[in-house]
Amino acid sequence: HLTKLVLTCRYCNRNKDNSYMTLESNLINIVLVDTIHPGNIGSVARAMKTMGLKRLSLVNPRIFPSDDAVALSGNATDVLKNATVYKSIKEAIKESTFVYATSARDRSIQWPIMNAEEAANDIYKKTCSNKEISIIFGKEDRGLTNDELELANKLIEIPANPEYPVLNIAMSTQIICYEILKASS
């Protein structure tokens, strides 16, 4: 059972009955692919919950469930308990009408790229229209492959120090979830 985060949508018109349209947080699916360390799953769950998101999908996690995930989740054990494990990214995103992927690496292939703030505004607008979206995060040590990125409509990049632009997966999730929360207020 997923709980709903109900927020007034600043991008949407009022409903016909003059009530405000709302965002349902269960329309935002955070997808972790091939996560190596279970503690990162717990940290991502915590990052999500602090920003009002609770829908977590795991594609081929190395170890899950795990005491390490629980230990690093803080009070976000409900997010872990409700997480769904999938065998493929396609299966995890099949309900989504729009998919975003994250990457810190330069690519030879060009994808439509947005920063976290732009993506969050776009995500929020889509969820106000009852569109389910997914945000895919890759394996800690290598990110997503080009084939995995091909499953996304847009790529999210978080600007960072060019000498060391790699963020931990939970940090990346926290930034994007924060931007979504910010876009909703």
Annotate each language-model stretch with its function.
Residues 10, 14-185:
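Post-transcriptional modification and biogenesis factors for structured RNAs
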Residues 1-7, 16:
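Histidine-centered nuclease catalytic patch
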